[in-house]
Amino acid sequence: MSFGSEHYLCSASSYRKVFGDGSRLSARLSGPGASGSFRSQSLSRSNVASTAACSSASSLGLGLAYRRLPASDGLDLSQAAARTNEYKIIRTNEKEQLQGLNDRFAVFIEKVHQLETQNRALEAELAALRQRHAEPSRVGELFQRELRELRAQLEEASSARAQALLERDGLAEEVQRLRARCEEESRGREGAERALKAQQRDVDGATLARLDLEKKVESLLDELAFVRQVHDEEVAELLATLQASSQAAAEVDVAVAKPDLTSALREIRAQYESLAAKNLQSAEEWYKSKFANLNEQAARSTEAIRASREEIHEYRRQLQARTIEIEGLRGANESLERQILELEERHSAEVAGYQDSIGQLESDLRNTKSEMARHLREYQDLLNVKMALDIEIAAYRKLLEGEETRFSTSGLSISGLNPLPNPSYLLPPRILSSTTSKVSSAGLSLKKEEEEEEEEEEGASKEVTKKTSKVGESFEETLEETVVSTKKTEKSTIEEITTSSSQKM
C-alpha cells in the first residue's frame, strides 16, 4: 500500500467517515440565527477540519507504512527518503495551516475586542440617548407646569373678564336707568318751563291788570276830584241860589223862612257829603282789595317762578353730574373693552407660541424616537454580528480543542506503532538491518504483518472516527446552546430597551 493511494483515499472517504456530510454541517451552522459572515466561513472551517483530519490520517498511514517498511525486501533507500521528505512536507504544511489558523484566530480575537469596544461605545451612546430622552421629560414637566400656570392666569383673566362684563352690564343698566330718569327729568323740566311760561303769561296779565286798575284808580280819583269839584260848584251854585232865594224870601218873610232854609241846606250838604264819602270809601276798598289780590297773585307767581328756577337749576346740576358720570362710565367701559381685546390678543399670541413650542417638542420627540430606533437597529445588527462572532469563536475553539485531542491521540497511536523519535534519521539503519536479517522469511511475515496492520488501521480509524464524531456532536451541542443563549440575551436586551423607552414615553 503506497502513500499516494492512502492520501487520496483520505481526501475522499475519511472526511465523510469522520465528519459526515459537509453540506449538512454547513447548513446546520448557517442557521437563521447566524449572520452571513458565519455562513461564508462555515465551509472554510469544514475544509480546514477535513484537511487536518486527512493530514492526521495520512500521518497515521505514514506511520503504518513505516511499520511495513522493515517487511518489504524490494524497498530501497531512495523511496524511503522520498517518503520521509513527503512526510516532512506534509508536517510543514500542517504547521503552516495551524499557523494560519492561529493567525486567523488572533484576527478574530482582535475583531472581538474591537466589537466589544464598539459595544461599550454604543452602550455609552445609548445611556447618553436615554439621558437625553429623560431630559425632554423634564422639559415636558416644566412645560406642563408653566402651561398650568398660564391656564390658571387665563382662568383668572377669564373670571376678571366675566366680572368686568357683569360690571359693564350693571353699568349699562345704571346708564339706562339714569338715562330714563334724565329723560323724565327733562320732561319735568319742559313741563316746569311750560308752567313757568304760563305763570309768566299770568304774571304779565296780572301786571297788565294791575296797570289797568291803577289807571282806573287814577281815572276814578280824577273823576272823584272832578265830581267833588262839580259837587262843590253845584253846592256853591246851590248856595248862591239859596242865598239869592233866601235873600228874596227874606225880603218877603225874613223872620219866618230863614231857619228852615238853613237846616234844609245843611241836610242836603250832609247827604251829599255822606254819599261822596261812601262812594270814595267803596272805591278805595275795591282798589285796595284788587291791589291786595294782585299783590298776592304776583307773590304766588314769584314764589312759583323761584321754586321752578331752583328746581330747574337742581335738575341742570343733576343732569350735569349724570352726564359726567355717564362719560366716566363710558370711558371706563372703553378702557375695559381695550383691556379685554389686549388680553385676548396676548392670550392668542401666547397660545400660538405654546402651540409652536408643542410642535417643536413633538418634532424633537419624533426625531429622538427615530434616532433611538436607528440606534436600536444598529445595536441589533451589532448584537447579530457579535452573536455570529461568538458562535464562530466557539466553533473555532471546539475545532482547535478537537484538533488538539485528535493530534494528541494520533501522536500516541503513532508513537505506539512506531516508537522511533525521528524516523528521518533512524529509518535507514532499521531498513538495512531488516533487509539483511529477514530476506528468507519475507513472504509469510509480510502477509501476516499486512493483516495485523490492516486490523490495527481499522481499529485506529474507528477510534479516530468515534472521537471525531464525539467532538462534532459536542461542537454542534455547544453551537446550539450558544445560539439559544445569544438569542435569549438579545431578546431580553431588546425587551428591556423597549420597556424602558415605552416607560419614558
From Swiss-Prot:
* The IF rod domain, residue ranges: 94-407
Q: Where is this region: Coil 1A?
A: 88-129
User: Where do the record's region annotations for Coil 1B lie?
Assistant: 143-238
Name the Pfam families for this protein: Filament, Filament_head
InterPro entries found in the cross-reference section: IF_conserved (IPR018039), IF_rod_dom (IPR039008), Intermed_filament_DNA-bd (IPR006821), Intermediate_filament (IPR050405)
Q: Where is this region: Linker 2?
A: 239-262
List GO BP terms, alphabetically: cell differentiation; cellular response to leukemia inhibitory factor; intermediate filament cytoskeleton organization; intermediate filament organization; nervous system development; neurofilament cytoskeleton organization; postsynaptic modulation of chemical synaptic transmission; tissue regeneration
Positions of the UniProt region annotated as Disordered: 438-505
Q: Which residues carry this modification: N6-acetyllysine?
A: 290
Stated role? Class-IV neuronal intermediate filament that is able to self-assemble. It is involved in the morphogenesis of neurons. It may form an independent structural network without the involvement of other neurofilaments or it may cooperate with NEFL to form the filamentous backbone to which NEFM and NEFH attach to form the cross-bridges. May also cooperate with the neuronal intermediate filament protein PRPH to form filamentous networks.
Q: Which PANTHER family match?
A: ALPHA-INTERNEXIN, GLIAL FIBRILLARY ACIDIC PROTEIN
Q: Indicate what this protein is called per its UniProt record.
A: Alpha-internexin
The protein's organism comes out as Rattus norvegicus (Rat)
